[in-house]
Amino acid sequence: MASLSLKNICKVYPNGFEAVKDFNLEIADQEFIIFVGPSGCGKSTTLRMIAGLEDISSGELKIGDRVVNDVEPKDRDIAMVFQNYALYPHMSVYDNMAFGLKLRKVPKDEIDKMVKEAAKILDLTALLDRKPKALSGGQRQRVAMGRAIVRNPKVFLMDEPLSNLDAKLRVQMRIEIAKLHQRLGTTIIYVTHDQTEAITLGDRIVVMKDGVIQQVDTPQNLYEKPANLFVAGFMGSPQMNFLDAVVEVQGDAASLKVAGKSIPLPPAKAKKVIEGGYDGKTVTFGIRPEDVYDSEMFIETAKCVFESTIKVYELLGAEVYLYFDLAEFPLTARVDSRTTARPGDTVKFAFDVEKIHIFDKETEQVITN
């Protein structure tokens, strides 16, 4: 296994387009790291530079203690799993998994041992004689992972490996990948645009936008303490609600003026906006859907209560999404499925002020979480 070090990594194409800009990251041995972001953010390009499939324009890449900028992909001791399984259709599962080892002229008895061990780990033993066309999508992806496992690489690189699977299979394969990481203790770098995959799988997540790292942190910290407006909106589904608010300061206290009402800020949050000189300024106020309440018990103790008319009601089993407007801003509340609110109803709701996020309107950087 191995650690990785990426220092000031840049990728600039001949036409001048900067796909990755000054990328800096230290990845620990056996860490499961996720690159996440929208299409075109540079996450797959970064993975391909690590693999050696893209040239690095500038910067230094180390795998372990070895600088590998100019090392051929086959000599980097890595294995890749792609979105497309890339299996040989005329070969059995066994031969697909063994193919790379045969090319490296590994002794036949060692190949047999390595393939069967990988098949056991991935629950493929009963399928070793089958051709890819006789397998389900999930089974094919497990074969692709098995082909990577038998190489016993220092680092696994996975580029959106679950994108071609249906929703149920994606959940199953997420669990399989998590188990695989625990069992093998490998370093894994995993690219996805799906923030649910990122949150459930990663030890740490690298959020990217326009080739630039926005934040690197644990899943919980990314969700609870986003560094900026982009991260706050990207991580979480439904996404965080955003409204414009004006800061009002009175002595050591501060509040946010939203839709004609004042929301008092907790002391720690008030201190941050006062020290930042935001009195009288417009800021962006963020609140996650699960921190918007319609329950009478919460509203009775809330310091600021709003009213709005429900536009859309979505039942998702144990919970309901309520969609409504506050002033000109669309909001979503994630509430208990026992709610009596329905479209057309005017309901009272309140925010959990301890969970408020405040962002600078111009820089979009967080002021306080």
Q: Which ranges hold each PLM region?
A:
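ABC ATPase nucleotide-binding domains
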Residues: 73-230, 234
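Glycine/charge-rich catalytic "coupling/switch" loops of P-loop NTPases
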Residues: 253-310, 340-369
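The feature captures the beta-strand-to-loop junction immediately N-terminal to the Walker
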Residues: 36-38
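Conserved post-Walker A/P-loop segment of ABC ATPase nucleotide-binding domains
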Residues: 54-62
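ATP-binding/catalytic-site motifs of ATP-hydrolyzing domains
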Residues: 60, 66, 212
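Helix-to-loop junction immediately C-terminal to a conserved catalytic motif
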Residues: 51
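Short coil-to-beta microelement around the adenine-binding A-loop and adjacent beta1/P-loop entry
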Residues: 16-18
